[in-house]
Amino acid sequence: MILKAAVENDLAREVLTAHTYTTSATEQHPEGITISNWFLRRIEDKDTKGTVVCAKTGFVAQSGNCAASYEETDSGKHYICVTANAHSSWRCIYDHVAVYQEYTK
């Protein structure tokens, strides 16, 4: 539900769909801060039966490497995939690829 709401918010969608995003300038960071979405860069060449347009990753001790991604298919269907407890950050990518390959129509 959080990712669905984020996709519907213009600023959140802009940040989550960008491979790199630079924040607005502040006194501490006059050039802004550049954020890189490694999930999008790593999944873009994988066969997911659609296009993963945005994603957010994270890590906490209780649930390990986690990721949420949003995919759009050529037929216009939209899918959200959420995974947790991957043993590595790369494994998050392959978990999402496997889920999209299995369930995307």
Residue ranges and their predicted role:
Residues M1-K105:
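Penicillin-recognizing serine hydrolase domain
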